[in-house]
């Protein structure tokens, strides 16, 4: 998942950023097959294209980033190797999708979140289990785990057969503001990465979970075009700030609005 930058990248002076429509972990290693029972692989039904990842939060619901959305989505659970699937792999399709706003009017720093209701529940198994929602917000300095089937390089699309994982740090929001001047004064996002560079989510990792001190705290949203670049951390939708919206939707209150 995490990208190790070559020396040439360190000489690049351009500071640019772009949404990670599907990101991969740079600088990481293959995830342990038993550490990501909640990780979901997302595909576009019509094209078969891989769209990113999500997290199973209960047997009927998946939480991911809004920009991973396609008209009809296929979701695979219990997946590690794409070529040699686990025997307990399960496949579902999206029944309903919910966004903070009906017109999907999210931005890079706000409302990049989507709830997917499955066409039928998945069953817990050796490689499938939901991830609990947070009961408290994360603390700056926390060690956070990122994971996904995203590209292993930011210079070419190299999608791995298995998910990669890496550890990064939860940073101050001001660290992201310094890297990306367009960011507003306040945002319902988390800033996370390694300021020295070398580890990051990248294309193909979008929608995957940011797990801080063992708790689901963020959703991979966007970051630098040069994944893992020095002082260009990533931005993650803050799950804790959207708990009321998430829980209300699941309870059947589809008229609930996201926090401002």
Swiss-Prot record:
Annotated S-S bridges: 31-165, 100-258, 144-212, 176-191, 202-227
Glycosites: 105, 124, 172, 213, 255
SUPFAM superfamilies: Trypsin-like serine proteases (SSF50494)
Tissue spec. comment: Expressed by the venom gland.
PANTHER family noted in UniProt: KALLIKREIN-1, KALLIKREIN-RELATED
UniProt domain Peptidase S1: residue ranges: 25-251
Catalytic residues identified in the record: 67 (charge relay system), 112 (charge relay system), 206 (charge relay system)
Listed GO biological process terms: proteolysis
Protein name as it appears in the record: Snake venom serine protease KN5
Record key words, sorted: Disulfide bond, Glycoprotein, Hemostasis impairing toxin, Hydrolase, Protease, Secreted, Serine protease, Signal, Toxin, Zymogen
Organism expressing this protein natively: Trimeresurus stejnegeri
Family the UniProt entry places it in: Belongs to the peptidase S1 family. Snake venom subfamily.
GO molecular function: serine-type endopeptidase activity; toxin activity
Signal sequence residues: 1-18
Role played: Snake venom serine protease that may act in the hemostasis system of the prey.
Compartments in which it is found: Secreted
Propeptide residue intervals: 19-24
Keyword Hydrolase: yes
């Amino acid at each position: 998942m995490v990208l190790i930058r070559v020396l040439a990248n360190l000489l690049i002076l351009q500071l640019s950023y772009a949404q990670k429509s599907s990101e991969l972990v740079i600088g990481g290693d293959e995830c342990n097959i038993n550490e990501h029972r909640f990780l979901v692989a997302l595909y576009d039904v019509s094209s078969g294209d891989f769209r990113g990842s999500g997290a199973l939060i209960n047997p009927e619901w998946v939480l991911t980033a809004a920009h991973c959305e396609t008209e009809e989505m296929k979701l695979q659970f219990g997946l590690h190797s794409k070529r040699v699937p686990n025997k307990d792999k399960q496949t579902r399709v999206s029944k309903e999708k919910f966004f903070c706003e009906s017109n999907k009017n999210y931005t890079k720093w706000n409302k990049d979140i989507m709830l997917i209701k499955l066409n039928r529940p998945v069953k817990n198994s050796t490689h499938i289990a939901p991830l609990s929602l947070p009961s408290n917000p994360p603390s700056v300095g926390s060690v956070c785990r990122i994971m996904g089937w995203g590209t292993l390089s930011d210079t070419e699309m190299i999608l791995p057969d298995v998910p990669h994982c890496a550890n990064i740090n939860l940073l101050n929001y001001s660290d992201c503001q310094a890297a990306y001047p367009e960011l507003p004064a306040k945002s319902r996002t988390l800033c996370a990465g390694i300021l020295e560079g070398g580890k990051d989510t990248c294309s193909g990792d979008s929608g995957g979970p940011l797990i801080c001190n063992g708790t689901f705290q963020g959703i991979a949203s966007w970051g630098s075009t040069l994944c893992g670049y020095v002082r260009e951390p990533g931005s993650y939708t803050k799950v804790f700030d959207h708990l009321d919206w998430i829980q209300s939707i699941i309870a059947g209150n589809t008229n609930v609005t996201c926090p401002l």
